């Protein structure tokens, strides 16, 4: 038996340096990543049997949502269609990256800030699985970015919100005016 002792220097957490121009975008964490896949069932098997994720939900578009801990989903898969972007080497492409912000109130400020900067909002509101209000836009290279808040958490019983409670909303205002059961923004 080998015994080892390690000393780890504890450092103070670093704070984010202020941008040259203030921004209301303050990311708490990378929330989830969505991939286009060529075979949804093969990929679902990989993410569950190899990577250890659990399926939270499937939606009517064939998407599969996976969780690793409490968030409703941290990985999601979308079936590739004819017009799905494809990388130069023929691989199926990235769908989007989602970043969590602190609150729905912050989302309103972020949306207004993005618009003032001339960035087109391609989606805002609340989709189905996960119940999280969000704002989506493209980065300069055309990658879809989602900023969101208040994602559903999956409890110890492993059950997520039933589909009949998903209540989609097409604006942030609508999402706040009609919160999901048990949610206060």
Predicted regions and their residues:
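Conserved short beta-strand elements that form part of the metal-binding/catalytic scaffold
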Residues: 4-10, 54-91, 138, 144-151
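Short phosphate-engaging motifs
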Residues: 42, 73, 106
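Short N-terminal helix-initiation segments at or just after the protein's N-terminus
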Residues: 5-10, 35-46, 78-87, 173-181
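Vicinal oxygen chelate
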Residues: 1-23, 29-38, 86-113, 117-185
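Long, hydrophobic/aromatic N-terminal blocks
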Residues: 15-40, 46
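Amphipathic alpha-helical segments
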Residues: 39-54, 113-116
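Short secondary-structure junctions
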Residues: 52-58, 121-124
């Amino acid at each position: 038996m080998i015994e080892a002792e390690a000393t780890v220097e504890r450092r103070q957490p670093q704070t984010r340096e202020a941008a040259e121009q203030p921004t209301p975008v303050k990311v708490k964490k990378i929330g989830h990543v969505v991939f286009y896949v060529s075979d949804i069932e093969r990929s679902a098997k990989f993410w569950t049997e190899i990577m250890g994720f659990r399926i939270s939900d499937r939606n009517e578009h064939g998407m599969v949502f996976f969780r690793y801990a409490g968030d409703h989903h941290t990985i999601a898969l979308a079936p590739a269609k004819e017009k799905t972007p494809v990388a130069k080497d023929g691989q199926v492409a990235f769908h989007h990256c989602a970043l969590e912000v602190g609150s729905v109130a912050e989302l309103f400020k972020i949306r207004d800030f993005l618009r003032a900067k001339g960035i087109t909002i391609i989606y805002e509101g609340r989709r189905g699985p996960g119940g999280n209000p969000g704002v989506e836009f493209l980065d300069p290279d055309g990658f879809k970015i989602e900023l969101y808040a208040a994602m559903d958490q999956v409890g110890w019983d492993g059950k997520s919100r039933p589909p009949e409670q998903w209540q989609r909303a097409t604006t942030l205002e609508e999402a706040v005016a009609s919160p999901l059961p048990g949610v206060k923004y």
